[in-house]
């Protein structure tokens, strides 16, 4: 017996390894087809400033973009933004930018806003945004440099310069929120939607 009842696998409009792992572990078959969109350009042109609103827009835009090329398929888009107070962060461009982000986040609490959207034939069928609050411990300059030495280029693949599912866990004193939200894919609301569409056996 299979858990997934859909006629075709879900399409995941993302190349995120963490999101792919979350879906795979939940028994959801998918085809990973990243969306080739200008995320920063779309966010800036939107005029939106709230991190959750930006994440929601980008998740929807990613899913809609891929949906245009795969008619009839259920396409899942996801995005995550990081906010320190009223200030939003982007993925660091290089090691120096990653170190700067870590200096700013160290010893403070920030928020991760994770959004999902499900689109079919250009129509958004489901959208959700979840928030996790992360408390990074105080870090010395030597600790920041040692961390960046160990993680290498991975520091530039995630906003905040860390992956909590990996070595990034060493940076934190406290984590408040859903584990899947932290990984960038609010899974429980998504599963609820899929069940409502009779796509899951459980």
From Swiss-Prot:
**Cleaved signal peptide residues:** none
Which cell locations does it reside in? Cytoplasm
The coenzyme or cofactor needed here is:
a divalent metal cation
One GO-annotated biological process of the protein: nucleotide metabolic process
A Gene Ontology molecular function term of the record: nucleoside triphosphate diphosphatase activity
Pfam families with a match to the protein in the record: Maf
Active site (UniProt): 79
Enzyme Commission number(s) of this protein: 3.6.1.9
Q: What is its main location?
A: cytoplasm
Q: What does it catalyze?
A: a ribonucleoside 5'-triphosphate + H2O = a ribonucleoside 5'-phosphate + diphosphate + H(+); a 2'-deoxyribonucleoside 5'-triphosphate + H2O = a 2'-deoxyribonucleoside 5'-phosphate + diphosphate + H(+)
Q: Which family does it belong to?
A: Belongs to the Maf family.
- Put simply, this protein is called Nucleoside triphosphate pyrophosphatase
């Amino acid at each position: 017996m299979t858990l997934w009842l859909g006629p075709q696998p879900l399409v995941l409009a993302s190349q995120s390894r963490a999101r792919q792992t979350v879906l795979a572990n939940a028994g959801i078959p998918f085809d990973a087809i990243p969306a080739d969109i200008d995320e920063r350009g779309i966010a800036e042109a939107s005029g939106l400033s709230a991190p959750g609103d930006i994440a929601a827009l980008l998740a929807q835009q990613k899913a809609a973009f891929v949906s245009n090329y795969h008619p009839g398929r259920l396409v899942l888009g996801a995005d995550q933004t990081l906010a320190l107070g009223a200030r939003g962060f982007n993925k660091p461009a290089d090691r120096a930018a990653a170190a700067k982000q870590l200096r700013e986040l160290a010893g403070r609490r920030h928020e991760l806003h994770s959004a999902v959207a499900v689109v079919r034939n250009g129509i958004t069928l489901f959208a959700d945004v979840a928030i996790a609050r992360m408390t990074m411990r105080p870090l010395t300059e030597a600790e920041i440099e040692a961390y960046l030495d160990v993680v290498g280029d991975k520091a530039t693949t995630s906003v905040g310069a860390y992956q909590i599912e990996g070595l990034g866990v060493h940076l934190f004193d406290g984590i408040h929120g859903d584990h899947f939200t932290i990984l960038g894919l609010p899974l429980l609301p998504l599963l609820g939607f899929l069940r409502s569409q009779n796509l899951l056996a459980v």
